[in-house]
């Protein structure tokens, strides 16, 4: 439901000025913001003034088909878009990477060679993969807080919120087949929204380019511009004969969407209007200076160092074996992605002086808040952050070290399943684990990262178990020799013979003991304290958020991203990352050929692409480059405010047609989860014409093109 921005909940609390209610006269930056689609009518005037030709109802409607009905949450952390009347779905290569890997083997290396289903029968099912369409979203604050009064405690408030949320979810999911719902807190609990989804779980792999296209540039180019990565994969949604969600079955038929995106062949020019429609994961736009300082000065540097150790170990062994490269390709990409992002985030925060800027803002807020209920918020937050820091540090080290030891995590999970009599579940875990496990990588990472834990984490946070093991073996290296040498979980055949009756032996195994002892330490010595302090901080942020809205009543506050559907709009724009340097907003095939190097894995393109380039056989996908010669567009950048989760999001032009799919941000702008800078923040998108060129000229899969609708 749409509201006008001023609400009073039933408790008679202070009036809260909500983000969408007042068009900003003091909005921080023109293209900053991740806006709720159901309230987009509050922004549509600004969007139209910048060139958008459609209405708010075209973007989001519950009464008629709208663009929202062509956008999906892909899996649990990406976005995808429907591009045909037969359920064809486009997302990023890195979003579908796990599925491509699962179908790959040395004999059928779809990661290396790509995969294209030339018929419906060849499309590959993906157990566990689902896509979710948003049916509707609405403000349910009054429903969720019904029964709460100011004299109740926070624990009682939590109970009321939980009970009311569960009841509401139960009611709305009974409305039809395949429905699931969530109730999400916005503005730190000042507002609650219901999100109702229809989830389809028969999603089949249709096509993916080879990694030399879909992952071109690898980790070297990740987060960077200019970019030349063909980061896309294609799936198809299937439904039962009535178009309802259904488990995989050969009897299922392609899903018929309410709406799908038409594809623009008109290309992009500097200044063109763009908007990204997707599911951004997490932002922290409103945290105070002390929270930012911890991120940039302590957390990011520590995590970068720990992941460097793991990446170096993986790289060493992956370069020596094709089998190991396949096994660890997805894991390596996962570790490297955040590793590089944190580096850019840290640099951006420091370059912008975000900590100092927030401190100055806090001084002005404190002066305004004198004599009000908000006067003590900032000192209390500052004190809580100081108390929280060592626990957060210990938790982050645990996550990046002990919790990342593959063998121990696996052993602990299998032992738990077997002890509970779940032999089938244990067998499934084992099959997936051993397929993609290489002991030397795991052991090498253990030695490096656990050594860092012992050195960097204050001794008061060292588990007693760890102290005993180091005293016993004398060094982390010797400890690793014993653990990996003695654990039966390094042997798949031995694990396959385990039964529930072997519980004592399993729990005495060094790998299981490692996992369990660290979990117990974290559960008793870290988590309870961190949870309590974070809870106190969140409660204060609820008041601080409300105070900021009263302090700046003309500013448009958008809710932090939380993996719910958002609209971010901006324009095609280059940028200057350094003095004397300007990056144009479009990259082309010429850049791919400049980077092409058969001696470097990440830059070794398919021979077929070299042949097409030599013959200039570009077909209808050709454009005239800056040098006046024919080329093919590859990627572009724009000023849309995006985050993790926006991977695979449709990038849409002024007429609502698809011009690309979002897949990254520029490295200099990765601090946009905390502070958006219009000079540096750019989202990187794959030009839809390069997708079509790849399907047509490299894959020769023109049957897919025939499903699509093109506009100029």
Task: Please report, for each region that a protein language model flagged, where it lies by residue.
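Bacterial N-terminal signal peptides
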Residues: 12-22
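Terminal presequence/propeptide segments associated with secretion/organelle targeting
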Residues: 2, 6, 21-712
């Amino acid at each position: 439901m749409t509201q006008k921005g001023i609400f009073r909940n039933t408790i008679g609390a202070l009036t809260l000025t909500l983000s969408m209610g007042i068009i900003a006269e003091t909005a921080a930056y023109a293209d900053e913001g991740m806006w709720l689609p159901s309230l987009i009518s509050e922004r549509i005037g600004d969007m139209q003034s910048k060139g958008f030709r459609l209405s708010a109802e075209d973007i989001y409607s519950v009464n008629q088909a709208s663009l929202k009905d062509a956008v999906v949450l892909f899996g649990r952390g990406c976005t995808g878009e429907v591009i045909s009347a037969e359920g064809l779905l486009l997302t990023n290569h890195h979003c579908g990477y796990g599925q491509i890997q699962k179908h790959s083997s040395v004999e059928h290396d779809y990661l290396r060679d790509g995969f294209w289903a030339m018929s419906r029968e060849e499309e590959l099912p993906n157990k566990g993969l689902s896509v979710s369409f948003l049916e509707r979203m609405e403000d349910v604050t009054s429903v969720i807080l019904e029964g709460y009064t100011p004299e109740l405690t926070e624990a009682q408030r939590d109970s009321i919120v939980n009970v009311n949320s569960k009841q509401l979810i139960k009611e709305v999911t009974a409305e039809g087949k395949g429905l699931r719902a969530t109730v999400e807190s916005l503005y730190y609990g000042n507002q609650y929204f219901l999100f109702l989804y229809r989830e389809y779980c028969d999603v089949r792999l249709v096509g993916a380019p080879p990694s030399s296209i879909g992952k071109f540039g690898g980790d070297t180019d990740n987060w960077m511009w200019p970019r030349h990565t063909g980061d896309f994969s294609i799936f198809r949604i299937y439904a039962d004969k009535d178009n309802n969600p259904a488990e995989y079955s050969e009897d299922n038929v392609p899903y018929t969407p309410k709406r799908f995106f038409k594809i623009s062949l008109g290309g992009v020019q500097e200044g063109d209007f763009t908007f990204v429609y997707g599911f951004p994961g997490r932002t922290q736009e409103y945290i105070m200076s002390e929270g930012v300082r911890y991120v940039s000065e302590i957390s990011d540097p520590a995590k970068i160092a720990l992941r460097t150790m793991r990446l170096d170990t993986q790289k060493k062994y992956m370069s020596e074996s094709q089998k190991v490269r396949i096994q660890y390709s997805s894991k390596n990409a996962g570790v490297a992605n955040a590793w590089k992002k944190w580096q850019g985030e840290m640099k951006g925060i420091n370059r912008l002086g975000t900590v100092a800027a927030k401190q100055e803002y806090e001084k002005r807020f404190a002066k305004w808040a004198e004599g009000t209920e908000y006067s003590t918020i900032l000192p209390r937050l500052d004190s809580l952050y100081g108390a929280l820091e060592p626990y957060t540090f210990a938790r982050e080290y645990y996550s990046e070290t002990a919790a990342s030891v593959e063998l121990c995590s696996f052993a602990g999970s299998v032992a738990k399943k077997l002890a509970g009599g779940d032999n089938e579940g244990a067998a499934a875990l084992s099959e997936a684990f051993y397929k993609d496990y290489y002991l030397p990588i795991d052991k090498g990472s253990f030695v490096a990262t656990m050594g860092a834990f012992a050195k960097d984490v204050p001794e008061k946070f060292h588990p007693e178990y760890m102290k005993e093991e180091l005293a016993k073996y004398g060094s982390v290296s010797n400890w690793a020799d014993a653990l990996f040498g003695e654990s039966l979980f390094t042997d798949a055949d031995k694990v396959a013979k385990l039964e529930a009756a072997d519980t004592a032996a399993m729990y005495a195994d060094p790998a299981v003991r490692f996992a369990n002892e660290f979990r117990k330490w974290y559960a008793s010595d870290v988590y309870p304290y961190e949870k309590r302090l974070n809870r106190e901080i969140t409660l204060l942020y609820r008041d601080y958020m409300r105070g900021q809205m009263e302090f700046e009543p003309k500013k448009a506050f958008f809710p932090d991203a939380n993996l719910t559907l958002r609209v971010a709009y901006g324009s095609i724009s280059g940028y200057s990352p350094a003095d004397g340097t300007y990056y144009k907003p479009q990259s082309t095939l010429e850049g791919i050929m400049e980077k092409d190097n058969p001696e470097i894995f990440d830059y070794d393109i398919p021979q077929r692409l070299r042949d097409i380039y030599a013959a200039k056989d570009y077909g209808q996908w050709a454009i005239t480059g800056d040098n006046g010669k024919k080329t093919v567009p590859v990627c572009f950048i724009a000023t849309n405010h995006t985050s993790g989760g926006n991977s695979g999001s449709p990038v849409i032009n002024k007429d609502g047609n698809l011009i690309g799919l979002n897949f990254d941000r520029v490295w200099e702008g990765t601090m946009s989860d905390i502070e958006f800078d219009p000079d540096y923040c750019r989202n990187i998108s794959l030009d839809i014409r390069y997708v079509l060129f790849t399907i047509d000229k490299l894959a020769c899969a023109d049957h897919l093109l025939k499903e699509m609708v093109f506009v100029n």
